[in-house]
Amino acid sequence: VHLTAEEKSAVTALWAKVNVEEVGGEALGRLLVVYPWTQRFFEAFGDLSTADAVMKNPKVKAHGKKVLASFSDGLKHLDDLKGTFATLSELHCDKLHVDPENFRLLGNVLVIVLARHFGKEFTPELQAAYQKVVAGVANALAHKYH
């Protein structure tokens, strides 16, 4: 991902304030509600029948936290996202057969959740930087598909 020094600094500074558990659970939950076809990968999570059930589901929250913990690792290695996410890309491609488009969707949902949580602090410039990051992460996760 090609970020300016200012963008890297702003992305890192905001991320330090992120509650990974809360934001991760909300982002994954919203993905499953807004794009219901993504639920097929999470059938073992139990009740996903309503938006309320999804957003309160402890397995969704736990996996969302796990997803954002991986995203945090990516932020520490912005110059080598493909290397950082190689194992996860392989898992999602070869074993889980996740549509790589879902990574892009989740990235966009994450940006929305960050905007919701940080309000005015999530400036258009910061959003632009985060869009670059989530696009880079989605690309790295889709790498094994190519």
UniProtKB/Swiss-Prot annotation:
Species of provenance: Balaenoptera acutorostrata
Positions where N-acetylvaline occurs in the chain: V1
Annotated heme b binding sites: H63, H92
Residue ranges of every copy of the Globin domain listed in the record: 2-146
A GO term, aspect molecular function: organic acid binding
Keywords: Acetylation, Heme, Iron, Metal-binding, Oxygen transport, Phosphoprotein, S-nitrosylation, Transport
Modified residues (S-nitrosocysteine): C93
Residue list for modification N6-acetyllysine: K59, K82, K144
Record's subunit section: Heterotetramer of two alpha chains and two beta chains.
Name recorded for this polypeptide: Hemoglobin subunit beta
Function: Involved in oxygen transport from the lung to the various peripheral tissues.
Family per record: Belongs to the globin family.
Database matches in PANTHER family: HEMOGLOBIN FAMILY MEMBER, HEMOGLOBIN SUBUNIT BETA
Key word Transport present: yes
Tissue expression summary: Red blood cells.
Pfam family, one: Globin
PTM sites of type Phosphothreonine: T12
